[in-house]
């Protein structure tokens, strides 16, 4: 009887664990060292689509790159980071004007988090009456927070006219956002604001400037491959042939 009861309880635990995993709306994965990718989800063209953001834990606090796409996860992300690292988010930088990057800017400003976008992104958000950051920066800027330094780099138009990437030159970590397509991607995705003529040139500029990245974090889908820049160029070539 005891064995049957134990088996039953184990079965319940497995089912509960599976349900939590399949219903998970926020996922945090370790990249390396103090770097983490967080993933939220939304529906796109009738299918569930992941959106990747990143954060780095510094001596002074946590720096967040982009905000959750799922608006219900603004606070859970802050809570999860604090529980895991015992540090608060102090800076948030959005990499372009679409809602999967900027949706949480107004929310995070209320908590005293310093929010940043480029001036171009700010102008687009203002014109569209969408959330704006507290501060604007030049497209190519250098930040030092705690023990980490990183660059915001505008290589040119692509997914949007304002998309920037984040480059950690010492750690060789490239946060590409939606400008760089995952190796899982079979097409270029949302082209509403895209410039497909400039996009390949932009990617090549990134390859020349951000050399030999150890990690490339894409805006959506799988981010674990270092071949995503080449894959983006391949998708652009295929698009031109249509």
Predicted regions and their residues:
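Bacterial Sec-dependent N-terminal signal peptides
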Residues: 1-22
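Metallo-beta-lactamase
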Residues: 22-26, 30-31, 61-62, 69-70, 119-158, 160-227, ...
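Conserved beta-strand hairpin/beta-sheet module of binuclear metal-dependent hydrolase folds
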Residues: 30-77, 165-178
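Divalent metal-coordination and catalytic microenvironments
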Residues: 34, 56, 66, 81, ...
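Structural recognition of the beta-strand scaffold that forms the well-ordered cores
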Residues: 37-39, 55, 63-65, 90-94, ...
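Active-site metal-binding motif and surrounding structural segment of the metallo-beta-lactamase
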Residues: 59-61, 72-116
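Short, electropositive alpha-helical surface patch
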Residues: 226-242
